[in-house]
Amino acid sequence: MATNNSYLLKNALFGNSAFSFISGLAAVLFSKAIANFLGLSASWIIFALGIGLILYGIEIFIAAKAEPVHKGIATFAVYADLAWVLGSAMLIFANLVDFTTAGKWAIAIVADIVLVFAILQFVGLRRLKNQA
């Protein structure tokens, strides 16, 4: 299946894909409840975010499924995940949005999970680069 010691990268991408897709699906199906939990009045923001996460999850899945793994999309995933983490921190600490305390914790926990995926994908890419 995986060649070039790409097991870590592929597994990280598959995990990221599943997490993103499932989170996106939940955001689309339960946008009003999630918005209320976070303290947002505009549930369309959660709905739109969900659509984006579904598309992102599909793209990352395609990259992971490719043989060999698509390094360009994997690199994009690392940067996109880091942007998500940075954006989450800004949302939590800048207080531009009046999130509930539970909402801030949820954002932080999701950001932690996304950061783990970014790190695993980065290490997987480095292993491929060092092998060449």
Language model feature labels by segment:
Residues 66-72, 99-100, 127-130:
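Membrane-interface helix-boundary motifs at transmembrane edges
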Residues 31-41, 94-102:
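Membrane-interface helix termini and inter-helical loops of multi-pass transporters
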Residues 2-3, 8, 59-69, 121-122:
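C-terminal ends of transmembrane helices
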